Amino acid sequence: MTTARDLAIVALDEATDKPVEQGDLSLTLAGAEVLDLLDAHALVLDGDRILPNAPSPTGDRLLDEAAASLVRQEPYESVEDWLWRRGRGLSAAYVDDLERIGLTTRSRGRRIPLRTGRTELVDSAARQRAEERRAAGEPVLTALAAAAGIGDEPAEELTDEAVTVLAAVGDAVMELEAVRQRKVIEDAAFDNVWRGY
């Protein structure tokens, strides 16, 4: 399993208590993919630029898609640009992929049996491993989860590459929150105009 998949599992597990913002999760999943691709030697970081290496299969469908979508010509993409491009709809892609491989199921409605409810994790080795990584306070997974709004920042030191990626993830999540707040303010102002205030 990958850090991105473990993060998706942790987020689905957490969603039973408090829903995780999908945009934030998509951005952090894209950051987790960068870190997984770094570990797989599919890319290297030059400052905040992503330089692709020779593609090699990782065994994970979504991670292989991520590696194939790396910009392979100069000027190479920055981590932040990657987060916004790759992150679009990524949380839904991970939920669908987890369901495809049998790690989640959709609960059925009691009154209308054809209607599907929320996505729920099944007991599996992948879920147990993700929970163990989180409980052990694995620094990268903990930092990514914190960026998505799940838990606190890790106390342990991170590698320079991880710090670079996590800083970009944090900036992107803050930018997304600013856009959300601006939209709420604009909508409230528009409503006030219609009410005559």
Predicted regions and their residues:
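Residue-level preference for nonpolar/small residues embedded in alpha-helices
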Residues: 29, 89-90, 137
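Short, structured motif recognition centered on aromatic/hydrophobic residues
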Residues: 34-37, 98, 141-146
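Ordered, amphipathic secondary-structure segments that act as subunit-interaction surfaces
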Residues: 73-108
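Short, amphipathic alpha-helical interface elements at domain boundaries
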Residues: 1-85, 192-197
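Short glycine-centered helix-capping/turn motifs at secondary-structure transition points
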Residues: 41, 102, 148-152
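Accessory beta->alpha helical hairpin/"wing" motif in late/C-terminal subdomains of nucleic-acid enzymes
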Residues: 47-67, 105-138
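Glycine-rich, aromatic-bearing surface loops/beta-hairpins
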Residues: 116-197
